Amino acid sequence: MIYGIGTDICDLRRIAATFERQGERFAHRVLSDAEFAVWKARSERWPKRGLSYLATRFSAKEAFSKAIGLGMRMPMSWRLCEIANLRSGKPVIVLHGELKEWFEARGLTAHVTVTDETEYAASFVVVEKL
């Protein structure tokens, strides 16, 4: 049964402007440690791809927060929600700490898709109750 659906579109120019003001502090606030390592490697090699990576993660976490009906309030937090990729490239949501406990206690599972273009990143999340 569908528990919730969330979607988000993110303007890469907005992410770039925030990054210009806050620098790596912004990436640390939004990304898990594993995501930060991927972002750092991509940014050093291809700055535009690093920005797109940051924007897709921001967008996916916003969409997830909407799908679970919490928005950005506890137990939902940026760093407890990680968007990883399977070897095939498929994005998956990996939860940590309090958020993982909250999610599992409700018997939920999530599906995520992300996309990015020149100026936008978008995400769609479907959460099911098993």
From Swiss-Prot:
It catalyses: apo-[ACP] + CoA = holo-[ACP] + adenosine 3',5'-bisphosphate + H(+). It is found in: Cytoplasm. Disulfide bonds: none annotated. It is an enzyme of class 2 (transferase). Keywords: Cytoplasm, Fatty acid biosynthesis, Fatty acid metabolism, Lipid biosynthesis, Lipid metabolism, Magnesium, Metal-binding, Transferase. Pfam families: ACPS. GO terms for biological process: fatty acid biosynthetic process. Its EC number is 2.7.8.7. GO terms for molecular function: holo-[acyl-carrier-protein] synthase activity; magnesium ion binding. Mg(2+) binds at D8, E62. GO terms for cellular component: cytoplasm. Its cofactor is Mg(2+). Its main location: cytoplasm. The keyword Amino-acid biosynthesis does not apply. Transfers the 4'-phosphopantetheine moiety from coenzyme A to a Ser of acyl-carrier-protein. Belongs to the P-Pant transferase superfamily. AcpS family. NCBIfam families: acpS (TIGR00516), pantethn_trn (TIGR00556). This is Holo-[acyl-carrier-protein] synthase. The gene is acpS.
